[in-house]
């Protein structure tokens, strides 16, 4: 209850204070100031005496605003002809003063000191005439003569001299120079040129010839050497290569041949055996022995028959990506289509030219133990999920 009364009393006090702000006075806090400002308009004739203001505390109240104006030069006497018509008299006086000021500005300035000299001076004469100038100057002389010109010029000199001539001409130069000589002579040309050089040299000679070429080259060398020879030939190649080697080697040989292949295989040593993978006359005992040697660990290289069967299985799935390994344990093969042959129909792909092959090796082979182990683990996981 007391709280409500306190709030009501405070709000009533504030309401009453807001209604009667004009009658508040704070004793010594009142401050009165009178401003007397003199202000002239643009013509400089009207004087203002204004702005009398009173201030009370924080509230600013203007109780009076006095504005008195009078005209400067105004006379209350009856003799003044402008007394009855103040504004018209002011305008007339103002125009008269402005007219007198303009006339004063227009008056020419005269030199009060009399200057001796010719009274008929040319008004267009040059005021900066040289007092030491030659009085006998040729009136027809060139006004644009170079002041730094040579005073000892030859009077018989050629008047048509080339203005762009070389000023540094050799005075001892040959006067009988060939007028048809090449003006673009190489300034860096060799001054020690052989005077007996061949004048019919090949104009199409190679300008980038090797300056360190062998001067003792074989003069009987083949002039029709292969222009497409490999420029990156091995500089350390065997100089004792077989001169009777087969010049018709297979250009489509596999560039990815196994570098660790066995050099003692029967079908490769001494050029014996058959090289075709599908040759029906292949030594059957050779393949049989190879299969029997690695039957237990399944680590033998994939045979041609295995590769052919694998290609038939994945023929419809071949792409430019490597296929999965053909085996799950041991050595197998992966196949993909070469990027350049990707647009060919799959039934027209060539085994040698359109397919890439590589050997893959599966290290971890599946066994019965692995299958049982995986089954037990799966059962344990399922039982844990469903029983809980």
Curated annotation (Swiss-Prot):
Residues 112-116 are annotated as: Region I. Residues 313-366 form the TSP type-1 domain. Residues 71-302 are annotated as: Disordered. Essential sporozoite protein. In the mosquito vector, required for sporozoite development in the oocyst, migration through the vector hemolymph and entry into the vector salivary glands. In the vertebrate host, required for sporozoite migration through the host dermis and infection of host hepatocytes. Binds to highly sulfated heparan sulfate proteoglycans (HSPGs) on the surface of host hepatocytes. Residues 104-111 are annotated as: Required for the binding to heparan sulfate proteoglycans (HSPGs) on the surface of host hepatocytes. The keyword Magnesium does not apply. Disulfide bonds join 325-360, 329-365. Residues 1-18 form the signal peptide. One of its GO terms (cellular component) is cytoplasm. Residues 120-263 are annotated as: 37 X 4 AA tandem repeats of N-[AV]-[ND]-P. Keywords: Cell membrane, Cytoplasm, Disulfide bond, Glycoprotein, GPI-anchor, Lipoprotein, Malaria, Membrane, Repeat, Signal, Sporozoite. During host cell invasion, proteolytically cleaved at the cell membrane in the region I by a papain-like cysteine protease of parasite origin. Cleavage is triggered by the sporozoite contact with highly sulfated heparan sulfate proteoglycans (HSPGs) present on the host hepatocyte cell surface. Cleavage exposes the TSP type-1 (TSR) domain and is required for productive invasion of host hepatocytes but not for adhesion to the host cell membrane. Cleavage is dispensable for sporozoite development in the oocyst, motility and for traversal of host and vector cells. O-glycosylated; maybe by POFUT2. It is found in: Cell membrane; Cytoplasm. Residues 265-280 have a biased composition (Polar residues). A lipid is attached at residue 365 (GPI-anchor amidated cysteine). Glycans are attached at residue 328. Residues 95-113 have a biased composition (Basic residues). Sequence repeats lie at residues 120-123, 124-127, 128-131, 132-135, 136-139, 140-143, 144-147, 148-151, 152-155, 156-159, 160-163, 164-167, 168-171, 172-175, 176-179, 180-183, 184-187, 188-191, 192-195, 196-199, 200-203, 204-207, 208-211, 212-215, 216-219, 220-223, 224-227, 228-231, 232-235, 236-239, 240-243, 244-247, 248-251, 252-255, 256-259, 260-263. The lineage of its organism: Eukaryota, Sar, Alveolata, Apicomplexa, Aconoidasida. Residues 366-388 form a propeptide. It comes from Plasmodium reichenowi. This is Circumsporozoite protein. Residues 114-264, 281-300 have a biased composition (Low complexity). The N-terminus is involved in the initial binding to heparan sulfate proteoglycans (HSPGs) on the surface of host hepatocytes. The N-terminus masks the TSP type-1 (TSR) domain which maintains the sporozoites in a migratory state, enabling them to complete their journey to the salivary gland in the mosquito vector and then to the host liver. The unmasking of the TSP type-1 (TSR) domain when the sporozoite interacts with the host hepatocyte also protects sporozoites from host antibodies. Belongs to the plasmodium circumsporozoite protein family. Residues 74-90 have a biased composition (Acidic residues). SUPFAM superfamilies: TSP-1 type 1 repeat. It is a lipid-anchor; GPI-anchor.
């Amino acid at each position: 209850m007391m709280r409500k009364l306190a709030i009501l009393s405070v709000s009533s006090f504030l309401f009453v204070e807001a209604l009667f702000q004009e009658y508040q006075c704070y004793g010594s806090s009142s401050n009165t100031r009178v401003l007397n400002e003199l202000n002239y308009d643009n013509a400089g004739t009207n004087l203002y005496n204004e702005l009398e203001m009173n201030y009370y505390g924080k509230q600013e109240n203007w109780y009076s605003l006095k504005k008195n104006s009078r005209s400067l030069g105004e006379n209350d006497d009856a003799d003044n002809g402008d007394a009855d018509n103040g504004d018209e008299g002011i305008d007339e006086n103002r125009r008269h003063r402005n007219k007198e000021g303009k006339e004063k500005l227009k008056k020419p300035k005269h030199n009060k000191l009399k200057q001796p000299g010719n009274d008929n001076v040319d008004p267009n004469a040059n005021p900066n005439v040289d007092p030491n100038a030659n009085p006998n100057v040729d009136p027809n002389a060139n006004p644009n003569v170079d002041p730094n010109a040579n005073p000892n010029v030859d009077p018989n000199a050629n008047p048509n001299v080339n203005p762009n001539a070389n000023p540094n001409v050799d005075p001892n130069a040959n006067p009988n120079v060939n007028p048809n000589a090449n003006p673009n002579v190489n300034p860096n040309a060799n001054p020690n040129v052989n005077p007996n050089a061949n004048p019919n040299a090949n104009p199409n000679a190679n300008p980038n010839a090797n300056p360190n070429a062998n001067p003792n080259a074989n003069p009987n060398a083949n002039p029709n050497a292969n222009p497409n020879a490999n420029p990156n030939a091995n500089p350390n190649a065997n100089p004792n290569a077989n001169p009777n080697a087969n010049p018709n080697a297979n250009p489509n040989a596999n560039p990815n041949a196994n570098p660790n292949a066995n050099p003692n295989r029967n079908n490769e040593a001494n050029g014996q055996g058959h090289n075709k993978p599908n040759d029906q006359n292949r030594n059957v005992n050779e393949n049989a022995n190879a299969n029997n040697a690695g039957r237990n660990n399944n680590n033998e290289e994939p045979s041609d028959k295995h590769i052919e069967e694998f290609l038939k299985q994945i023929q419809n799935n071949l792409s430019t990506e490597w296929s999965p390994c053909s085996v799950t344990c041991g050595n197998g093969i992966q196949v993909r289509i070469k990027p350049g042959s990707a647009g060919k129909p799959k039934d027209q792909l060539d085994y040698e030219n359109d397919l890439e092959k590589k050997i893959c090796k599966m290290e971890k082979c599946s066994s019965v133990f692995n299958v049982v182990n995986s089954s037990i683990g799966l059962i344990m996981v399922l039982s844990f999920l469903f029983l809980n």
